[in-house]
Amino acid sequence: MIEEFVEIEDTKHAGFAAAMEIYADAFPANTRFEVDLLRERIDKRLSCLYLGYLEDEVVFMALLWPLKNTEFILLDYIATKKNYRGQGIGTAFMNQINQMLSVINLC
């Protein structure tokens, strides 16, 4: 099962490139934002990128967008690496996020 979910606050982090590969594989081009736009949003803390690790490999990514001046957070994109799908990784992430939201400010 997944080892941990971590928020990446700096797109120079090694996991960012792996997350973008999962993102590109999971979503059709006409539904994706450009990587440069995502990089800018994450670096400016307008969006939050979470990665899921299994044996030091990034196997999951989620992009969250806290909506300004509201208490709402949009789960913009969520994806699991193709050969790890169907193992409950997305469910585990949703459970963790629900716990986090009950005690802290997410981003």
Residue ranges and their predicted role:
Residues 80, 86-99:
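Conserved acetyl-CoA-binding loop-helix of GNAT-fold acetyltransferases
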Residues 26-55, 63:
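Active-site rim helix/loop that mediates acceptor-substrate recognition in acyltransferases
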Residues 99-107:
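Conserved GNAT acetyl-CoA-binding A-motif
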Residues 1-36:
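Short amphipathic alpha-helix that is part of the acyltransferase structural core
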